[in-house]
Amino acid sequence: MYLALRQAVLRRAGLAAALVAGAITVTGAADWPEWRGPSRDGHSTETNLPGKWSPKGENLAWRIPIGSRSSPVVFGNRIYLNTPTGDPANTQERLVALEAETGKIVWERRFSLYLSDVPQHRSSWASPSVDPETGNIYLFTVAAQLVCLAPDGKVLWNRSLPDEYGAVTTHGGRTTSPIIEGDKVILNALILAWGDLNRTGNRYFAFDKKTGQTIWIASPQTRHYDTNYSTPIVGTIDGTRALLVGGTDGAYHALKLNTGERLWSLDVSKRAILNSPLFRDNVAYLTHGEENMDTTEMGMIAAVDATGSGLLTTDAFKWRTRGFLPTFASPVADAERLYTVDNSAIVGAFDLKTGAKLWEKTLGTLQKGSPVLADGKLYVGTENGKFYILRPSATGVEVLDEDVLGTPQAPEVIVASPIIADGRVYVTSMDALYAIGKRVPRASRVAPMAPAPMAPAATAVVQVFPYESLLTPGQTVSLKARLFDGKGNFIREEPAAQWTVEQLTGAVDAKGTYTASPAGSTAGVVKATVGAISGTARVRVIEPLPWAWDFEAAVAEAPPAWWTGAPGKVFQRTIEGAGKVLMRPRDDTVGRRSKVFFGQPNLSGYTVEADVRGREQRRQRGDVGLINERYGLVLFGNGQKLELHPWQAADEMTARVPFIWDAETWYRMKLRVDHLADGSARVRGKVWPAAEAEPAAWTIEKIDKIPHQMGSPGIYADGISDVYFDNLKVYKSQ
């Protein structure tokens, strides 16, 4: 009934074409469908919220022993929480659906993690998001897998960004929470893909929320410092619906929502931006806790005129206050003041018009979560395990309630931000989820819509949809040319576009249907031209197994164009005694641990083989390996061992044996995955000197009880020294 009312409202309003209308958000008055709430600013309009409670019972509705480092979301009578589960040998991320009234588990779905550098204790980093139109839930795992689930928990579609885009995950675990806006689900990830995405960097993705197809990919950054988890917010800037987000380059960026084009960028920090901005009335409020770009001072809180364009300068600041360090927490604001919490759990208040610091109060010593503002109160938890309810004013702050979760000797760490829904405050520690206050379900309502777009002007952008396709020989894809004006307003789909192909075999007809050639693999773009304006879609065509590369026919250094994660990392070179090979040179830059994928993400039942060789440089030896269905077989140079794992950072999930190998000798590696009748997988690896006959016995083996069912084949190298590959083969297992 709850969801049906929303859908009926949409139909009556004639808002099915969400693309035309821009962003339309329809929620219940008390829903909290995304990490920062229905308005994406950490603010709730609810009243009569609890000002006092106790973990021992007062105003405590329930507590369940399911914790997380991410915040839950609430939609209707369901709470959705991303949480780790399983012992260290079988850790997974799981999405749990809870009954809001009681905390009872309604359903859960588990996701095995793969090929990630994120350690187990940092899994379940990102909050899920709910689409108010359909009730579908979106989850982005620390393995960089985006999953769409129906309200009953059925998986509708998923995108594996490592296989498809060479997504890189790191030890820090930083993973962005997706947002749903109109017909799009939007997130960012660090990737190295193929074609024009041939540089390691942070990219912003818009996927069709119903199908998972790629709408656009934006690359506003020119450099990369570190990973981040700044979740985008949405605002209307002079009639342009825009995303505002902090980048891994130390800049804030504003992008056109419908096209991904950059409106402006503003450099503010010498490290990645981790928190999210605020936006009101063409003013963006930006914060960070690192060294400033133009001074050696640390930390910044600023108000910026968001109506600019291009690369903004310091002239864009309406005011700027330095010296307060909110690295992790995102700000909140009422009509007069901005509130945020620094790294040391000091909450501060700043005048919204001038930036002047009004007061500060120490809450603890460590801070990760963001505050939430509602009913004239600030709700904030600290990493020291204390949860506060505060009443701020212009002159100071009153502590209404202060509680320790757990015990003073063993406090429950609070990393997640609190949320508010249906009269309750929900607090998540690493150990438990608390529901505070009496639940008061509210009547559904339609939230204020985004301002109606201006009448479309002349065509400024041709967007080809879907933006990315992966085909087999002879397969077709129907492409559409979408026209947008200079403010990102949708005009129409253009039936008379002129279609051409570039770097691709195959052909495209006058209606935009591309047909791949009947044989061979290729990669390139299909271009649509309307007048003097063109747009492109990226297309890869990969032939069925078997594949074999000995690299002898190579005429250029670059590897095959359809390989993902290869540009700038691996090169076809000639070396003495071996002829032409594939080389991963020594590399100290971002993405030193390189994974290169060369197949479809849904492949299974195959074997990968290759000759490999290392090299000692500066008394260091790199690592080299193969990838099969999201399992890695890796020879460690310095460690002189062989490992077999689905998730390298998960030590208890890794099989390993000592293996002495010479840096100047070629070895043959072989990796095979077999799916067994009991639902488990037998993963086996073999290594032997390439000049010798293949031994009958496997060198290493692992039985995985939470197996991966599919994944692209690939190669792996840790570039602390040169490593080499030759005679690479992928074929169906017999």
Question: How would you name each of these model-derived features?
Answer:
Residues Q648-K670:
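Short, aromatic/His-centered strand-loop micro-motif at the edge of beta-sheets
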Residues A30-E34, R538-A566:
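Extracellular carbohydrate-recognition regions
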Residues A443-G486, S534-P546:
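Short S/T/G/P-enriched beta-strand
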Residues S54, A556-V581, T589-R592:
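Extracellular glycan-recognition surfaces and repeat-rich motifs
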Residues I24, G28-Q463, K480:
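Noncatalytic, solvent-exposed loop/strand surfaces
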Residues E576-A578, R584-E652:
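Secretory/extracellular carbohydrate-interaction modules
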Residues F551, V608-A610, T665-A677, V683-V687:
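Short tryptophan-centered beta-strand motifs in secreted/extracellular beta-sheet-rich domains
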Residues E694-Y724:
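Flexible glycan-contacting loops in extracellular carbohydrate-active proteins
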